[in-house]
Amino acid sequence: MLKTVKISANSKTGPIAVTYRSGEHETYGTCPTSCSLHPKSETGTSQIDSEYLAAVFDSVPRGGQAWTYSHFAAEALPLPQPNKTVINASCDTTAEAVRAVELGRPAVYAAPLESADQWPRKIHGVTFAQCPAELADNFNCQQCGGGRPLCARGARDFVVVFVAHGTGKKKVGTDAAGGCYAASGPVAIQWHKTRTTGAPNDAAALRAFVRGLPYGSFLRHHIAGDCGLELGAA
């Protein structure tokens, strides 16, 4: 199920196009079960939706930029290509992030709350730098990188760090299940609503949505959700 928004009101993304993706039966139905931020109460999936992933990869606004994040294994994600969506491997450990970079995938790292003052730093020769929107008020994705958001740069040799935020932030980097920032608050409201009101053919809906975006638009796929195939989906 897919929810599309032409102009987001989210302060961190800024007024850009965004999407939310959920399962039909479970909000976390498109997210990998292996994700350490996944709540125990949600099942998730172990399978990528290949048709939808292809749609995401292709869905870049004309003259614009698109990016997203996935908690599926880095090697299962497409390598960056010109004029395609940049799909960042979302990693739970610095070791995973370094490996993703070695595999040629752009990577981001969900860092524990107590690490906020540790960035930037190098780990095994790879630079880890915190998301600029976390370091300054009134700064967002639209302004990032002088028109080239860091997360929209596929061929990069550094990892973007997102320090834990949201009500479950203290769980990130621990053995406790959960920690997903989208588990509560305004993001959760929109995400849960996607399950009941979103477009059922999400691949087709996404392609149609992108065709209608203005030239030069920025698109962040999946404020919440992932590229998985919900268990039991046709």
Regions found by a protein language model. Give the residues of each.
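Class I S-adenosyl-L-methionine
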Residues: 1-234
